[in-house]
Amino acid sequence: MESFFNNSFATLIAYMGVITIYLLVIPLLLFYWMNNRWHVMGKYERLGIYGLVFLFFPGLILFSPFLNLRLKGSGKG
């Protein structure tokens, strides 16, 4: 019975690690990448980023209220 709890705990830790990477780590890296490279990306890089946005959409939605990727104005007006 004790090995069952050890296996369950190990499985729970593994799931938490995967969920953390999927919902937190990779979306934050993707936001950072898009924010720094948006105006200099080539077409294949942009296509790859669009694919990653599709793949990691749930994590990006979690951070969308807090991160701002709007264009910065020229400061005139």
UniProtKB/Swiss-Prot annotation:
Pfam families per the UniProt record, alphabetical: NdhL
Enzyme class: translocase
Enzyme Commission (EC) number: 7.1.1.-
Main location: membrane
Membrane topology, record value: Multi-pass membrane protein
Localization (cell): Cellular thylakoid membrane
UniProt-listed InterPro entries: NADH-quinone_OxRdatse_su_L
Catalysed conversion reaction: a plastoquinone + NADH + (n+1) H(+)(in) = a plastoquinol + NAD(+) + n H(+)(out); a plastoquinone + NADPH + (n+1) H(+)(in) = a plastoquinol + NADP(+) + n H(+)(out)
Coiled coil, from the record: none
A GO molecular-function descriptor: quinone binding
Keywords, comma-separated and alphabetical: Membrane, NAD, NADP, Plastoquinone, Quinone, Thylakoid, Translocase, Transmembrane, Transmembrane helix, Transport
GO cellular component: plasma membrane-derived thylakoid membrane
Residue spans crossing the bilayer: 12-32, 47-67
Domain of life of the organism encoding this protein: Bacteria
Family assignment from sequence similarity: Belongs to the complex I NdhL subunit family.
Subunit structure: NDH-1 can be composed of about 15 different subunits; different subcomplexes with different compositions have been identified which probably have different functions.
Function of the molecule: NDH-1 shuttles electrons from an unknown electron donor, via FMN and iron-sulfur (Fe-S) centers, to quinones in the respiratory and/or the photosynthetic chain. The immediate electron acceptor for the enzyme in this species is believed to be plastoquinone. Couples the redox reaction to proton translocation, and thus conserves the redox energy in a proton gradient. Cyanobacterial NDH-1 also plays a role in inorganic carbon-concentration.
Protein name: NAD(P)H-quinone oxidoreductase subunit L
Originating species: Prochlorococcus marinus (strain MIT 9312)
Lineage, highest ranks first: Bacteria, Bacillati, Cyanobacteriota, Cyanophyceae, Synechococcales
The encoding gene: ndhL
